């Protein structure tokens, strides 16, 4: 059925071709023309950089004080062992970090399958070689810390925060948390009914075996959708800064003239002239007050001194006086 010309086609997951246990091809179609590259590039970048996973972050090897040393009876030097440990594909359920141990003796390869761990830890590449012991008397013991994270975090990024409490012999490892090792995409032609200008997106993905390809696509799409949510509703959701409202008038101007504690004679003269608030008083001039019946120079001097003690004076101009709160009274 022919849809509206403005209606976008919605892609669907067409096929998951499992090339191997760690290699899959995921096909999505149909896509509007150009959307294959738009979505393919976005998903590719997220799958490479933003997938959560687990990685080795710290190692303690018995008898080893620093990474620039060797261990008797072990073919590889310590730096090479640390590099091999970065290749461990570990999956941890329900925890953010775990400690796993490795104890091996006797000539031969030491592999990931020799590691001892709890039931909530799964090693996806048990055949991965960590090192080689060169004689029957050789042995190696290590404690390996595995943490959950995202992306790539070099050991140098953690040195400054951990060096004060990190004991000698605890070796830091560059952490590659992403379970996706390689990813590429291709855009091919697709057809729906009479339309032949559509895209088909084929994502070619290799993982370390700890994440299912279909789940990886689902997680990447969820991350992308969450990041785009802000563009769906472009209203400014920032919390506005609360501006402190400054009072229109100095609070002292709103106080009654009785608070000035004038003499009874002076106070009565002011009330007779309907001067009830200090704000009313400071707007009067000396000439105006001297015209007030029974208010002489002595009372005027008293009023001026009391106002001056409060940083006020006669003859002040107050815009918008009286305020609404006083006017209503």
UniProtKB/Swiss-Prot annotation:
Disulphide linkage map: none
GO biological process assignments: DNA-templated transcription
GO CC annotations, alphabetized: cytoplasm; DNA-directed RNA polymerase complex
Annotated GO MF terms: DNA binding; DNA-directed RNA polymerase activity; protein dimerization activity
Catalytic activity: RNA(n) + a ribonucleoside 5'-triphosphate = RNA(n+1) + diphosphate
InterPro entries the UniProt entry points to: DNA-dir_RNA_pol_insert, DNA-dir_RNA_pol_RpoA/D/Rpb3, DNA-dir_RpoA, RBP11-like, RNAP_asu_C, RNApol_insert_sf
Keywords for the protein's UniProt record, in alphabetical order: DNA-directed RNA polymerase, Nucleotidyltransferase, Transcription, Transferase
Superkingdom field: Bacteria
Keyword Transferase: yes
Transcription among keywords: yes
Pfam family, one: RNA_pol_L
EC code: 2.7.7.6
Renumbered residue ranges of the record's region Alpha N-terminal domain (alpha-NTD): 1-235
Region (Alpha C-terminal domain (alpha-CTD)): 249-329
Enzyme class: transferase
NCBIfam families: PRK05182.1-2 (NF003513), PRK05182.2-5 (NF003519), rpoA (TIGR02027)
Function description: DNA-dependent RNA polymerase catalyzes the transcription of DNA into RNA using the four ribonucleoside triphosphates as substrates.
Family: Belongs to the RNA polymerase alpha chain family.
Free-text comment on this protein's domains from its UniProt entry: The N-terminal domain is essential for RNAP assembly and basal transcription, whereas the C-terminal domain is involved in interaction with transcriptional regulators and with upstream promoter elements.
Subunit structure: Homodimer. The RNAP catalytic core consists of 2 alpha, 1 beta, 1 beta' and 1 omega subunit. When a sigma factor is associated with the core the holoenzyme is formed, which can initiate transcription.
The protein's name: DNA-directed RNA polymerase subunit alpha
Recorded name of the encoding gene: rpoA
């Amino acid at each position: 059925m022919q849809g509206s010309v403005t209606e976008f086609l919605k892609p669907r997951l067409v096929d998951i071709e499992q090339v191997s246990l760690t290699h899959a091809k995921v096909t999505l179609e149909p896509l509007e023309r150009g959307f294959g590259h738009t979505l393919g590039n976005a998903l590719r970048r997220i799958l490479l950089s933003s997938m959560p996973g687990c990685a080795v972050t710290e190692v303690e090897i018995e008898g080893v004080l620093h990474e620039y040393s060797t261990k008797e009876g072990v073919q590889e030097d310590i730096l090479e062992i640390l590099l091999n440990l970065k290749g461990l594909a570990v999956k941890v359920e329900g925890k953010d970090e775990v400690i796993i141990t490795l104890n091996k003796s006797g000539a031969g390869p030491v592999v990931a399958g020799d590691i001892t761990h709890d039931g909530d830890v799964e090693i996806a590449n048990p055949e991965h070689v960590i090192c080689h012991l060169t004689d029957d008397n050789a042995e190696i013991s290590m404690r390996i810390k595995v943490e959950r994270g995202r992306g790539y975090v070099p050991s140098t990024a953690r040195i400054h925060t951990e060096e004060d409490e990190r004991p000698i012999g605890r070796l830091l490892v560059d952490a590659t948390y992403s379970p996706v090792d390689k990813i590429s995409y291709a855009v091919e032609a697709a057809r729906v009914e009479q339309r032949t200008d559509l895209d088909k997106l084929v994502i070619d993905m290799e993982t370390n075996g700890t994440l299912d390809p279909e789940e990886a696509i689902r997680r990447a799409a969820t991350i992308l959708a969450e990041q785009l949510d802000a563009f769906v509703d472009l209203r400014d959701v920032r919390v506005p800064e609360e501006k402190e409202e400054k009072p229109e008038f100095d609070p002292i101007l709103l106080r009654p003239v009785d608070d000035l504690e004038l003499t009874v004679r002076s106070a009565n003269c002011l009330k007779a002239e309907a001067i009830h608030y200090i704000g009313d008083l400071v707007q009067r001039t000396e000439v105006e007050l001297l015209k007030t019946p029974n208010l002489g120079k002595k009372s005027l001097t008293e009023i001026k001194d009391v106002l001056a003690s409060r940083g006020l004076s006669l003859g002040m101009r107050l815009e918008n006086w009286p305020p609404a709160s006083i006017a209503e009274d």
